[in-house]
């Protein structure tokens, strides 16, 4: 039997191992305490990190809290403790307390996030944290070379830690993140915790081999496999892997086999799908028991010491639970706090136009505004498919591309490859990396080439970007601008280059949506978009890029348009038309045709909303209460188009003023065809607007 330990003579690595062993016991006691509280209906969900303790704590010794950046997943409880999250703070989240520092009671347990620790607020989406982690690592490179950037901090040798279960390796976003990390030589530690299951799905049912075998030979990626149940092995291999990253040698995938002695969560019963002998084997290979035996064998502890530490940590967790249970719960009214923060400033009115000022197209106004804003703010980076001019090695020999519509032409040449660059053809990659950059204080401007191809980025837009402020209770923000070419009227655009769908994103809390129709508004709204600290979907109608009718002089630099403020295109007192995007001009044409027929002012008021989220309810209500009639015109399909929301609002807020039913004109529930007559039959035409206005006025 080993002699009783004498802390004074234990060497430093063993002393650290004892301290970490204490944290491992705290982690396990927290799981057990939450399970007890869940069974007592005092917490409402429980998911454990049991079996993963040695992995998290073995790595933590080489990681640096509040220095490195962390994108953990829900089994990283032991790591979070090592980084500085306290047992009380974890239990505050479990009970849903107002003082929960991660989310103020908004998120499930084990969804940590503390800005002061660089511990990024996480979502429940498996694997979706990988792409923001890549963006964070990119930001480290960028910021460390520009230490003067306001609100941005980097040390030069920090790394980004991102973890996931083996099951999440089936997600495409994981593979996209590996590809980019390896190609860009980024300082990322990918930790894959393999407990053999994704809830009830065996790893062998998902992949032909463990992930460390599948990526062996992946160029630019070091691959490490370790027994994650053994703290000392993890600590040794982890130290080497992390040192590899810190010296700039590139990313590491760290694959660790671990156990899952408890079910996936308390909503699961693993005895339904795991045989008894398998669970017995896991119990025999419990990392905490192995750790205790190793410490005893090395003379760091005696069995009595292990029992004493177990009792002490149990009492510590029990006391923390009492504090959490006695903490106040959130005020239900606070559920509307921290959804989004719209910059608040006065409508600037008409811009002052310099005599003989150059008049530019809608597309050129956007291009020049991007150039202007990039010159002002070095935090802005523009990236996406084909946005760069050309490969730097041939830039002096060619004219340059600058986007399929030329909107980013010249930005790379003016500001360099670090600030305007091409990405893989992967929309989730584009947006997800932007999320990570934004979390680090940069002002990323991502481009989605066509709205029709935005769908692979839906999870990053709606779950990672849009929820950032709310899920962290205001601790984190995501100042990301996503420019998207949208809409039809192209003649030949066909199905996948012609559609709109702004109403889908209007349904997502946390996203701001701009949809300008003329050059000056595009400039004013884009300036405001860069001033926002929340994600902005900046919709640019392709048909409007080079038209003559919506050209304007570039407004003065200080001319910014507030979101949520529409504008009167025409004035009238007989009917109101609400519209946006490319249908604004078609509505003007329709009113012009009606006026030409009668040689009089037909009294129709056209309102251009300019932004969809938020949208200007006041201007609509004021107009409809004066005119008594409302027609809403949009390019999107009629069913569930954004016009339905406006119609519902008008019926509610203006019912007693209405002299006729609210009318809507949009695309039928079909797709845009290639042959021009098919497109004309789908998208609202001037003749359709004239027809509906006549009927509305005659009602």
Give names to the regions the model predicted:
Residues 55-56, 129-133, 169-177, 199-200, ...:
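Short glycine/serine/threonine-rich phosphate/pyrophosphate-binding segments
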Residues 1-161, 180, 189-322, 326, 336-535, 539, ...:
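Thiamine diphosphate
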Residues 171-192, 462, 466, 471, ...:
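A short alpha/beta connector and helix-capping loop motif
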Residues 174-177, 236-243, 367-369, 467, ...:
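Glycine-rich, charged/polar anion/phosphate-binding loops
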Residues 167-172, 229-238, 516-523, 639-640:
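Active-site glycine- and acidic-residue-rich loops that bind
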Residues 311, 315-353:
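Terminal amphipathic helices with adjacent charged low-complexity linkers/tails
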